[in-house]
Amino acid sequence: MNVINGKKIAQNLQASIKLKVDTLDRKPGLAVILVGDDDASEVYIRNKEDACKEVGFYLEIINRFDNISQEELLFEIERLNHDDKIDGILVQLPLPKHLDVNLVIETISPKKDVDGFHSENIGKLMQNKPFLHPCTPKGVMLMLESIEIDLVGKNCVVVGASNIVGRPMACELLNAKATVTICNSKTKNLSCKLIQADIVVVAVGIPKMIQSDWIKPGAIVIDVGINRLDNGCLVGDVDFESVRKVAGWIAPVPGGVGPMTIATLLKNTLTAYEARI
């Protein structure tokens, strides 16, 4: 078993981004909107703030109370759409229930949609003509690239069908000419599908759901899940200790996909910057 060190891969990617930024006349600009005071969201934003400082980006963090109206939030996004200092816009999810998440995402200019969630960017990904990739799936692809795996013809199973990870993950793998099966936590005989997979990507939000007897010996297992247990420990959707004894490669939680998501966000911001100059 080999561990895919997402933290190290992300550091290398961020170092290459910094080298590029050092040659630019203007720093790429990222705006992050945080609505409310969700503790987990604040941690994620601090991580993004640290990463932006590391690569030399301009960062604007906009904090709004959780009672902000839909109209006020959309007005803020439109302001950023027209701000020449800002190349990328990110609205930290989740949002309070009274806000329409889809409308918020669609209001962000697709040219500044560095999360890669706008329908225009998802459509380009489906056509295999991507511009700004959804960050987590692209981060997974970069992890697979780092171990020099040839995806052509590989049997891949994606467990989880969210718009943020599962669906775009399947598109990324299809674009790499892999054979892809999409499942979810309710899929019948899930273990039978997984045992045939060369590559497994899991994002369902169920702690330690995937067990070692579901995994083909030598398979590559990418755990996207982040779950905090009652004792405060962070674990993934894969039972790491048992699966590591079977898998050929495995991405751990923490230290796997998480750092790659942030690094890919920075990569998207640089791409958006370059498209505007």
UniProtKB/Swiss-Prot annotation:
Keywords: Amino-acid biosynthesis, Histidine biosynthesis, Hydrolase, Methionine biosynthesis, Multifunctional enzyme, NADP, One-carbon metabolism, Oxidoreductase, Purine biosynthesis. GO terms for cellular component: cytosol. The keyword Hydrolase applies. GO terms for biological process: L-histidine biosynthetic process; methionine biosynthetic process; purine nucleotide biosynthetic process; tetrahydrofolate interconversion. One of its GO terms (molecular function) is methylenetetrahydrofolate dehydrogenase (NADP+) activity. It catalyses: (6R)-5,10-methylene-5,6,7,8-tetrahydrofolate + NADP(+) = (6R)-5,10-methenyltetrahydrofolate + NADPH; (6R)-5,10-methenyltetrahydrofolate + H2O = (6R)-10-formyltetrahydrofolate + H(+). Belongs to the tetrahydrofolate dehydrogenase/cyclohydrolase family. Homodimer. This is Bifunctional protein FolD. It comes from Vesicomyosocius okutanii subsp. Calyptogena okutanii (strain HA). The gene is folD.
